[in-house]
């Protein structure tokens, strides 16, 4: 008797990533405390971290904290960077006025906030060496994938 296709996919996923149960903690930015990833990994699933907003030192700390609490699998996920925005002060002023109707005034410099350096985040992930690295909204550059594979880090596409 053959397995149901869904069970076959779940079994293959578990085998590929050495899991006991097909549970994957969603790697959401700012919503993945190490303690939760540890609990998921210790229960046999895959812990996760959405590193979009994390500086390199925070990536290192998260991986170190998770390693201290589990021998189970976990992933670090990065959002592929968007192209630089084309700024338009008139449009930004209109958006700030609109948002000001619903809460505190948005300062003009709010649009100047820059995300963490993507290359530095990638380096931090390679140095920290999570079980798995994954991406969303695109693929890593080939040079990064080659280095990741040379370190034995799995890539979940």
Which residues does each predicted region cover?
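Active-site entrance/lid segments in N-terminal catalytic domains of soluble metabolic enzymes
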Residues: 2-157
């Amino acid at each position: 008797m053959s397995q149901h296709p869904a069970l076959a996919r779940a079994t293959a996923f578990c085998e590929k990533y050495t899991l006991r149960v097909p549970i994957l903690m969603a790697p959401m930015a700012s919503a993945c405390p190490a303690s939760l990833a540890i609990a998921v990994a210790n229960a046999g699933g895959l812990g996760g971290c959405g590193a979009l907003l994390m500086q390199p030192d925070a990536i290192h700390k998260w991986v170190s904290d998770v390693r201290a609490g589990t021998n189970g699998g976990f992933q670090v996920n990065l959002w592929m960077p968007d192209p630089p925005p084309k700024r338009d002060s008139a449009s930004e002023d209109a958006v700030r006025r609109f948002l000001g109707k619903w809460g505190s005034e948005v300062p003009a410099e709010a649009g100047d906030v820059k995300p963490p350096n993507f290359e530095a985040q990638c380096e931090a992930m390679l140095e920290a060496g999570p079980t798995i690295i994954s991406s969303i909204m695109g693929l890593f550059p080939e040079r990064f994938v080659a280095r990741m594979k040379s370190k034995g880090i799995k890539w979940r596409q």
